[in-house]
């Protein structure tokens, strides 16, 4: 096998490899990460939890400005390219620039001792992608071993990669200015050559989200919904999917002791049902506590990999310390969560589709039931809002409209994802709900306890029996009471001492929705959806 891997690397331009560490065990990776001679960002540190912690330097998140896709015959008419009217992260790269950065990365990886991980992206055999990740850094190999689906011995014996990720995080591009790139760092994709190149950034998530962007290209073209969501399944086989941007509660709310986890971030939905793309979870750890998120807290043990957390001198972790970044993370193999779908992370068709939003404006209700038209409207809008800054007195919310709750990872036009999703929902008779995990008129965030109560009411069907009212401006159907949920919060107007305050904020937010949706009003279908949005 090693000879074959070496030959395949040589075909990519990676030559004179000193040694190939092929699909190492967790034990082996631990020893590699703990080597005393390691320096800088290669160095792992053992924590009292048993998990290894690493730092990724200035790159504590993705570098969307450094993302490029090679423009060629195959991609010119399919990719949703960035434009002056609608900006996105899919910037075109020329063939000649690609050749030049490919040489940089292959030169960097040549004459080295390399880690090669072969794994799958996609739990469904019909549509899964065989991925090979090549890196010179042990913990990066550990990260992808955690995050992708680990093949069996038999699958490895016949493994032929469909796609290769070459991680050259130690190399930067000196010619970036002449080539019209954003910086010396790059995250580039060649869909025709089936290769991803990484240079300059050490952030682990570039490998995970890179493959997600590719699944988002290939699968919808085959009629399979590709979704930035978490998913779980109840005892009766009822499947729920939770869409949402980072920090809205996807991982937290789908990790539920009463239901089995399918996955926490990326899924497909085909003729057989919903399936995970990944073999692990990548959870945020800022302010993590055993009390609020017991399953995630307990998943942080040997074989988990922490990124950018603050480790105290005694090796314990200070989860509340966001001094390196608010985006502290842990990756772990999915089986670190007790309650998962086994042996394959897939289940039947979804009957509940939940859109999570964290509305910092304090306008949206904690839960509303959507009509089919509203489902399309709120899916394409992909709204959430953050509270800016941690300085005292600065509480100005910043709205984010991210198409399909994952604009950064969409390789095709957003309407293609909406179309496939709605088709799948219609076929399974799925209902959609908008759940606000953010703030209300009290100035406080809606409690996890109330949000869990809302999710329970959606999943056990009690929301269907609730008497409904309507929220003006947004025309959303809201329940008047739900078991286990504080009734005072269900209508957001009731959380304000003065309802006129809600009205003013609601008009402001509605205006932002209307403005954002103008980009979809370029055809008849888009124009027809405007009626499902807020009315001023």
Swiss-Prot record:
KW Cytoplasm (keyword) present: yes
Pathway annotation from the record: Carbohydrate biosynthesis; gluconeogenesis
Keywords: ATP-binding, Cytoplasm, Decarboxylase, Gluconeogenesis, Lyase, Manganese, Metal-binding, Nucleotide-binding
Cofactor(s) listed in the protein's UniProt record: Mn(2+)
Gene Ontology CC terms: cytosol
Amino-acid positions noted as binding Mn(2+) in the UniProt annotation, renumbered to this chain: 209, 228, 265
Catalytic activity: oxaloacetate + ATP = phosphoenolpyruvate + ADP + CO2
One Pfam family recorded for the sequence: PEPCK_ATP
Compartment(s) where it occurs, according to its Swiss-Prot or TrEMBL record: Cytoplasm
EC main group: lyase
Superkingdom of origin organism: Bacteria
EC number: 4.1.1.49
Positions annotated to bind substrate: 62, 203, 209, 329
Annotated positions binding ATP: 209, 228, 244-252, 293, 329, 445-446, 451
Single Gene Ontology MF annotation: metal ion binding
Record's function text: Involved in the gluconeogenesis. Catalyzes the conversion of oxaloacetate (OAA) to phosphoenolpyruvate (PEP) through direct phosphoryl transfer between the nucleoside triphosphate and OAA.
Protein family membership: Belongs to the phosphoenolpyruvate carboxykinase (ATP) family.
Subunit structure, interactors included: Monomer.
Protein name: Phosphoenolpyruvate carboxykinase (ATP)
Upper lineage: Bacteria, Pseudomonadati, Pseudomonadota, Gammaproteobacteria, Pasteurellales
Gene behind this protein: pckA
């Amino acid at each position: 096998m090693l000879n074959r891997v070496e030959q395949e690397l040589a075909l990519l331009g990676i030559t004179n490899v000193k040694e190939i560490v092929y699909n190492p065990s967790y034990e082996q990776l631990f020893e590699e990460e703990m080597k005393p001679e390691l320096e800088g960002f290669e160095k792992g540190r053992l924590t009292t939890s048993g998990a290894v912690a690493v730092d990724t330097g200035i790159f504590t998140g993705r570098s969307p400005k450094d993302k490029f896709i090679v423009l060629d015959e195959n991609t010119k008419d399919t990719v949703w390219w960035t434009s002056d009217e609608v900006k996105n992260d899919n910037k075109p790269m020329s063939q000649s620039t690609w050749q030049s950065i490919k040489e940089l990365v292959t030169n960097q990886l040549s004459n080295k001792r390399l880690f090669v991980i072969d794994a799958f992206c996609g739990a469904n055999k019909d549509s899964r992608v065989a991925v090979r990740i090549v890196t010179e850094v042990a913990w990066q190999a550990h990260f992808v071993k955690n995050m992708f689906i680990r093949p069996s011995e038999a699958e490895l014996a016949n493994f032929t990669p469909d796609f290769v990720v070459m991680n050259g995080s130690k190399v930067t591009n000196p010619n970036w200015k002449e080539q019209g790139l954003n910086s010396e760092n790059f995250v580039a994709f060649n869909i025709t050559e089936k290769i991803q190149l990484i240079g300059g950034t050490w952030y682990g998530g570039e490998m995970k989200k890179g493959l997600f962007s590719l699944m988002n290209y290939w699968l919808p073209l085959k009629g399979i919904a590709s979704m930035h969501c978490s998913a779980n399944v109840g005892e009766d086989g009822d499947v729920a999917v939770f869409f949402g941007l980072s920090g809205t509660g996807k991982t937290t709310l789908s990790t539920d002791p009463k239901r089995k986890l399918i996955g926490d971030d990326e899924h497909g939905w085909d003729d057989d049902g919903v399936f995970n793309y990944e073999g692990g979870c990548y959870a945020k750890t800022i302010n993590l506590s055993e009390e609020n998120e017991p399953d995630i807290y307990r998943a942080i043990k040997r074989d988990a990999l922490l990124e950018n957390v603050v480790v105290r001198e005694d090796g314990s972790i200070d989860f509340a310390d966001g001094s390196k970044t608010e985006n502290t993370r842990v990756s772990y193999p999915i089986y670190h969560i007790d309650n998962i779908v086994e042996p394959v992370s897939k289940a039947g068709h979804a009957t509940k589709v939940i859109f999570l939003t964290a509305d910092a404006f304090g306008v949206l209700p904690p839960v509303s039931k959507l009509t089919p038209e509203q489902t399309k409207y709120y899916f394409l809008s992909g709204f959430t809002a953050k509270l800016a800054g941690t300085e005292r007195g600065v509480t100005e919310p910043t709205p984010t409209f991210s198409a399909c709750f994952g604009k950064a990872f969409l390789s095709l036009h957003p309407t293609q994802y909406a179309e496939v999703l709605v088709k799948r929902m219609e076929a399974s008779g799925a209902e959609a709900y908008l759940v606000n995990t953010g703030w209300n008129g009290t100035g406080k965030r809606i409690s996890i306890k109330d949000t869990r109560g809302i999710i329970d009411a959606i999943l056990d069907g009690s929301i269907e029996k609730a008497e409904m009212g309507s929220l003006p401006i947004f025309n959303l159907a809201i329940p008047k009471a739900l078991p286990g949920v504080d009734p005072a919060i269900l209508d957001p107007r009731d959380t304000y001492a003065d309802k006129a305050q809600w009205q003013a904020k609601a008009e402001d937010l509605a205006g932002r929705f209307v403005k954002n949706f103008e980009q979809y009003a370029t055809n008849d279908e888009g124009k027809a959806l405007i009626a499902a949005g807020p009315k001023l």
